Amino acid sequence: MEATSTAATSDKQRSSIHALPVLQDNIIWIWIKGNQAVVVDPAIAEPVKTWLRTRKLSLAAVLQTHHHADHIGGTLELLRDWPNAAVVAAAEDRDRIPFQTISVRDRDKVSLLNSSVEVLAVAGHTRAHIAYYLPTNKEDLEDPAVFCGDTLFGAGCGRLFEGTAEDMFKALQRLSCLPAKTRVYCAHEYTEANLRWASALHPEDVAISERLADVSSRRQRGALSLPSSISEEQRTNLFVRAQSSKELAELRHHKDQWRN
C-alpha cells in the first residue's frame, strides 16, 4: 500500500513524497528528488532499504520529529548502509537521539535536496517534538508540506506524554497558521478512529460526517487517508478547532478514555 503526493513525477528533478506504511499503523514518509531521498521517522529499516534500492535511490538524510522508538528504531541500521546520510533532530533531544548529525532548534532552516526546510518547535506529545515545513516552490513542490510526526494527526493530535495541554494548543495553533493548502504528513494512520470519536461527539457536524464517510471508503479499499491538508484539519479536527488549552485538555481526556 503506497500513497503518493507529487508535483510532477514525470520530471525526475522535481520532488515527490511517498508513503511507506509499516508496523500496525506507522507511516514512513519518503521525499525524493532525482536519485536522492530523505526519510522521515523510520520506525524500522528493512522496508525502507528495499524501497530505496528498488528505485536506485540514495539516502541523503533522515528527519527525526521526536525520540520515540517507533520513529527512530530504523535509523542506525539505515546509517550502516548509507553512512554519509545526515540525521536531523532537535538539539534538545541530543541525549535521546545521540546519533543526530545536524542539531536544530525552532525556526532553523536546513538545506535538503536543494530545498530549504524550516524547523518548527511543536512540543506537547514530547517536550522536544519538532516538525519540518517545506514552503511552496512552483519549480518543485506545487503545495507546501509539513512533516508533523505525532503532533497533528488526521482529525486528531498526539497524546500528552511529556507536554501540557497548553503546549499542544500552541503547537496546533502554530501549524494551523500554515497556508491552508499545506499538505499534512503525520506519522500514524489514525484518521478513521479519530473521526468516529469526533462524530460521536458531534453527530450533527456535516463536515466531520462527510470526511468520515470518505475516509472509511478509502480504508475499505486499502488506501491511506493521508496526507490531509491544513484546511481539512481546520474544518474537521476538534483539537485544531479548540478555542483554548482548557477545551483541548477536556477533549484530550475524553479521547483518551473513549473506546470505539
Swiss-Prot record:
It is an enzyme of class 3 (hydrolase). InterPro entries: Clx_II_MBL, Glyoxalase_II_hydrolase, HAGH_C, Hydroxyacylglutathione_Hdrlase, Metallo-B-lactamas, RibonucZ/Hydroxyglut_hydro. Coiled coil: none annotated. Keywords: Hydrolase, Metal-binding, Zinc. Its EC number is 3.1.2.6. It catalyses: an S-(2-hydroxyacyl)glutathione + H2O = a 2-hydroxy carboxylate + glutathione + H(+). Zn(2+) 1 binds at H66, H68, H125, D150. Pfam families: HAGH_C, Lactamase_B. GO terms for molecular function: hydroxyacylglutathione hydrolase activity; metal ion binding. Its cofactor is Zn(2+). One of its GO terms (biological process) is methylglyoxal catabolic process to D-lactate via S-lactoyl-glutathione. Thiolesterase that catalyzes the hydrolysis of S-D-lactoyl-glutathione to form glutathione and D-lactic acid. Belongs to the metallo-beta-lactamase superfamily. Glyoxalase II family. This is Hydroxyacylglutathione hydrolase. It comes from Prochlorococcus marinus (strain MIT 9313).
